[in-house]
């Protein structure tokens, strides 16, 4: 085995072409294998993953050349069958960044599908010291959730198989590894790209902790072709867990996703999402005129923005023509009255834009019309490798098509000019997560994969030239969401609710976020840690729109009528979860009527978000306040000299708990009166230092309080 030193890293080259990476007494072993040819048997959203009869190149690679340089090491290997892979490794302190350059010199064209990326880390003998490390990665598994459980105590051999098709870094962070809690050492890996996505098949407890991921890079490879794919990032460091999170955050910053936006101004939004008509056999409201009559009431509840979705049941999420408002919203007179009334009441109006495509059939029961885009612009749609149009339940737009992107920008400007829109909620930006194999486009097939996010930089810039007040809200929910958006969804948080609380609906809950093995097993301390780490790696200037219910989550269950979370968890628990979401430090969204029966409490919380300076302008400290109970949620907020804290019982049982404030989180030499900011009742007077020692509270089932620390 040949060994090279590169800054603080040692890189060894094995006879099979794998790379061994070492630093500070820790090591990782990694390799890339090219997956090619085969067939995608189904024309569905799973085209990128449901592949059959594929071939592999690189399981046993041959070393061709090594070029050591001062700041990097270049390793060239032959994968076989005409493929050559060059690794470019550049150390940056505890981080090692790797770029891969794939070349082809064979005779016959090859259809590249993806690179299989394997990383072997901690050895089995070290599992008793190791816990999972993955800020922003959702540990939503079918067994009890404990972020500090040692690796030898997990039952699942594949710890994270549930996120196999998440498109990191857009729909999960993709950070995976382990932390040695005894020796304070971390090893982790992730992948950064605006073109290629990392989809992880598993994190396996084999002889070593082994990550197996797919770097999706579909294209045809012909003689003389090459493709540069990166960046692969490796972290080996001896440090505390929070310091390791900061290393990850600094790495994500280099991707250029940060924005110079005023986050505190952006998060002062309470958005109401609403659809008119029937969806999932449930009708929230029948007409736009009825909704217009509700605007004053909704404003008085504390909402300051309304998101208007296409008409249901048709066209629903089938695109007809963005600029054909009668076809998309049906009742244009009612829509105009709604917008006018919303603005009169001081509410911003957000239009929902759906990007995946139109249905290519007509259902006479829905009085449906065929989208003119299907015939007028066939080049706007993706093709499968078989030459047919790609589709899920709609024919799939190719979001990398420049003409289609111009149409999107034109449509946004039209809504801003003619319909007085204030912003846009962007749906299904990665729903069409597969390549466009149409070789007449002049674009690479992989350019379609993440184009829905990448395109927003240019679209946003064009729209803001004419309408600088406009804002954009993406369904993505991870660091890559910083591309062209002020707001992002919180779908990376929804798994927390059933992990923290018991599901009481006898029907159960949506399996997308719910596992019976993990239901009600997570402690608030772990949840707070996960929230803090997830928030730390998000791009600056992008605000997470927190929510308990959305139109999507309401239908995930597949039940007739859908399922609101007040139905899943019960009304009392719902109020605790709503408060948590509202005070996690982002914007807030609610689905119309999802809060039915709880309007007064929801209104009180929404108004606090907008009117209390500590929440409007302050900072959320997820882990600064804690309780000696697994099921007591705590949050701490500060702003200048003000402070507030939330304490909520997540369980259907009364309890007495001791709540403690982290030392240094608030001046210990002042006295405060804890006053409930909703009821106005005072709990008592305390020296702030006493909060560090602990204050006892008795909480009835699902009792919750938002306390102001009123200086006396």
Tell where the protein language model's regions lie, with residue ranges.
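Acidic-aromatic substrate-binding/catalytic surfaces of carbohydrate-active enzymes
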Residues: 2-76
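Polysaccharide-binding surfaces and accessory modules of carbohydrate-active proteins
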Residues: 30, 35, 39-40, 44, ...
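N-terminal structural segment of carbohydrate-active enzymes
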Residues: 96, 121, 141, 150, ...
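Carbohydrate-binding surface patches
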Residues: 162-174, 178-182, 624-666, 708
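Substrate-binding/active-site clefts of carbohydrate-active enzymes
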Residues: 258-259, 265-289, 296, 301-304, ...
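Hydrophobic faces of well-ordered beta-strands that scaffold small-molecule active sites
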Residues: 270-272, 306-308, 349-351, 424, ...
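Conserved alpha/beta catalytic core and glycan-binding cleft of carbohydrate-active enzymes
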Residues: 460-461, 467-597, 610, 620, ...
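C-terminal beta-strand-rich structural cap/linker in extracellular carbohydrate-active enzymes
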Residues: 688-712
């Amino acid at each position: 085995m040949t060994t090279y030193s590169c800054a603080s890293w040692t890189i060894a080259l094995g006879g099979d072409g794998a790379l061994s990476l070492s630093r500070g007494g820790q090591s990782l072993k990694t390799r890339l294998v090219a997956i090619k040819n085969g067939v995608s048997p189904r024309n569905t959203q799973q085209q990128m993953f449901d592949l059959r009869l594929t071939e592999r190149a690189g399981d046993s690679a041959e070393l061709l050349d090594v070029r050591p340089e001062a700041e990097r090491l270049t390793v060239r290997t032959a994968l076989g069958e005409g493929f050559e892979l060059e690794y470019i490794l550049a150390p940056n302190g505890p981080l090692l960044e790797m770029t891969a350059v794939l070349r082809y010199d064979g005779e016959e064209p090859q259809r590249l599908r993806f690179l299989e990326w394997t990383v072997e880390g901690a050895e089995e003998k070290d599992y008793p010291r190791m816990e999972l490390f993955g800020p922003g990665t959702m540990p939503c598994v079918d067994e009890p959730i404990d972020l500090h459980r040692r690796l030898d105590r997990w039952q699942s051999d594949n710890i994270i198989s549930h996120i196999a098709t998440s498109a990191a870094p857009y729909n999960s962070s993709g950070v995976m590894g382990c932390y040695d809690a005894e020796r304070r050492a971390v090893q982790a890996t992730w992948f950064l790209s605006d073109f290629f996505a990392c989809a992880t098949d598993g994190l396996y407890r084999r002889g070593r902790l082994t990550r197996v991921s797919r770097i999706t890079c579909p294209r045809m490879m012909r003689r003389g072709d090459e493709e540069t794919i990166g960046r692969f990032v490796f972290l080996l460091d001896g440090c505390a867990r929070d310091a390791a999170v900061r290393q990850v955050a600094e790495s994500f910053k280099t991707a250029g996703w940060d924005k110079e936006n005023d986050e505190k101004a952006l998060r002062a939004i309470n958005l109401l999402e609403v659809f008119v008509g029937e969806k999932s056999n449930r009708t929230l409201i029948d007409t736009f005129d009825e909704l217009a009559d509700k605007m004053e009431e909704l404003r008085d509840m504390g909402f300051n923005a309304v998101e208007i979705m296409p008409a249901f049941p048709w066209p629903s999420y089938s695109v007809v023509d963005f600029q054909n408002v009668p076809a998309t919203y049906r009742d244009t007179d009612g829509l105009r009255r709604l917008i006018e009334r919303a603005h009169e009441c001081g509410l911003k109006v957000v239009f929902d834009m759906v990007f995946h495509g139109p249905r290519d059939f007509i259902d006479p029961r829905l009085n449906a019309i065929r989208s003119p885009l299907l015939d007028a612009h066939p080049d706007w749609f993706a093709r499968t490798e078989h030459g047919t149009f790609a589709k899920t339940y709609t024919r799939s737009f190719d979001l990398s098509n420049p003409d289609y992107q111009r149409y999107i920008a034109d449509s946004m400007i039209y809504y801003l000019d003619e319909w007085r829109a204030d912003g846009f909620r962007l749906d299904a930006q990665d729903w069409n997560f597969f390549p466009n194999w149409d070789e007449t486009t002049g674009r690479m097939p992989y350019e379609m994969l993440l184009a829905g996010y990448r395109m927003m930089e240019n679209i946003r810039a064009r729209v803001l030239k004419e309408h600088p007040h406009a804002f954009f809200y993406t369904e993505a929910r991870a660091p890559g969401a910083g591309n062209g958006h002020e707001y992002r969804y919180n779908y990376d948080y929804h798994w927390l609710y059933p992990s923290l609380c018991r599901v009481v609906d006898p029907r159960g809950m949506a399996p997308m976020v719910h596992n019976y093995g993990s239901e009600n097993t997570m402690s608030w301390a772990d949840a707070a840690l996960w929230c803090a780490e997830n928030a730390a790696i998000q791009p600056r200037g992008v605000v997470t729109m927190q929510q308990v219910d959305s139109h999507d989550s309401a239908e995930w269950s597949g039940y007739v009528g859908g399922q609101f979370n007040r139905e899943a968890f019960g009304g009392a628990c719902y109020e605790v979860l709503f408060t948590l979401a509202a005070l996690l430090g982002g914007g807030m969204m609610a689905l119309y009527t999802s809060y039915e029966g709880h309007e007064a409490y929801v209104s009180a919380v929404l108004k606090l978000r907008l009117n209390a300076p500590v929440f409007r302008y302050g900072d959320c400290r997820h882990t600064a306040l804690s309780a000696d109970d697994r099921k007591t949620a705590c949050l701490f907020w500060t702003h200048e000299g003000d402070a507030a804290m939330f304490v909520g019982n997540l369980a259907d049982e009364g309890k007495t708990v001791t709540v403690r404030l982290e030392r240094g989180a608030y001046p210990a030499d002042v006295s405060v009166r804890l006053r409930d900011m909703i009821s106005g009742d005072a709990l008592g007077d305390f020296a702030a230092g006493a909060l560090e020692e602990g204050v006892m509270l008795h909480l009835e089932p699902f009792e919750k309080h938002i306390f102001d620390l009123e200086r006396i």
